[in-house]
């Protein structure tokens, strides 16, 4: 099992991405970082010698790569799609490494990229019964779609209340696969 984030999440939140359960096993950590901007001082890099950590990148900057390797990170070279990592290519690389289960703990840009490149099979959503409106952050940013028929559909299969929040698990149905 692995957990994946984008470089912006590392820069903004400095997560550790470890298991919080007593005697739990830490997931493999994957940072999608097209241009190698992950701070060497981040928690994820500082703990890379103890917890398997991959940096997925399109960069060939050997001096930066050497710094990450010195900290214990392994590098996954991926193709580029536009200005970002080709996530489908990354999924193929991870599959070749026997990593077949992945939790995307992404920010809105990473979430959109993953949905746009159709690498998401299911989503787990927590919804708080609050309305923010205005310019509040959204869980998915990016280009979006112009027409309702082009929207990515969610087919819920589990729904529960957790405290005051709602938890929904859904299968992702992409437009070309909709009935």
What is each stretch, according to the model?
Residues 1-179:
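Enzymes that bind and transform nitrogen-containing heteroaromatic metabolites
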